């Protein structure tokens, strides 16, 4: 049986804490959920706390199996009742909760793996390891995520665990797994832009402009551009260095803007570069799926001849627009051949 433990020292969250939950079921009174950070204890999102607007369909607001942040509005520790609210969660709360949850989950996964290697039996021993390490630092610094930073610090300074009173074998296994599992996490950064040109160059101008941004793509900071629906595009990059990633997209955007202006095209930043949360990822995936379905429908309505004329002139939503493998060159070659004919 797999060992389990809550992520933090306190057994229950406090009122106004924002916590990550997974939806179990939906009933007349509201939605039953598991509090993922508190060893899956049960809570309820009351129907009146799902949305600020009039509820027409619960399933449009919350779905079974979905994971999302909610705020705690009542805790009865004696009876184990926890009431939660979705409508009171702000976008800032979502971002902070998502980041905290990711760090706490990484520590939980690490300590459970260490416990498995050491052959711990029973959740009590896992909690004891938590008490000596993660929860020790949580109480010392009054910060739920400080353990993540200290664990990472131990890669270069193992003495941070000297105050934890760990057995030599436990400390050795812990340090070994931290080095393998807590390397700098890769973060995804995203920006939304609109790029269009209604002049003579048309789609070629758009391709040339986007390619200008993609020329800044490197192995360390790969830049991708996905088509959502003309003229909307999503730019993304993945990196272990958040600041460098944000800067890379900002510079790429300016290159695209400058190139677009050369063609008297239109360019607009819809969303400046920002760190992508789990919710953003899910939203982007849905939009790409929808765009793919719409493109497939349009493609099905066109005859083969029309499709041949437009080869290389549209982006595949499932593939990044890459300057090394774009269809722009192929399209231009075909146009030249047609002119010769």
Curated annotation (Swiss-Prot):
Signal peptide: none annotated. It holds the Pfam family EIF_2_alpha. It is found in: Cytoplasm, Cytosol. Phosphorylation of eIF-2-alpha impairs the recycling of eIF-2 between successive rounds of initiation and thus leads to inhibition of translation. Residues 300-309 have a biased composition (Acidic residues). GO terms for molecular function: ribosome binding; RNA binding; translation initiation factor activity. SMART domains: S1. Belongs to the eIF-2-alpha family. PANTHER family: EUKARYOTIC TRANSLATION INITIATION FACTOR 2 SUBUNIT 1. Eukaryotic translation initiation factor 2 eIF2 is a heterotrimeric complex composed of an alpha, a beta and a gamma subunit. This is Eukaryotic translation initiation factor 2 subunit 1. It comes from Drosophila melanogaster. The gene is eIF2alpha.
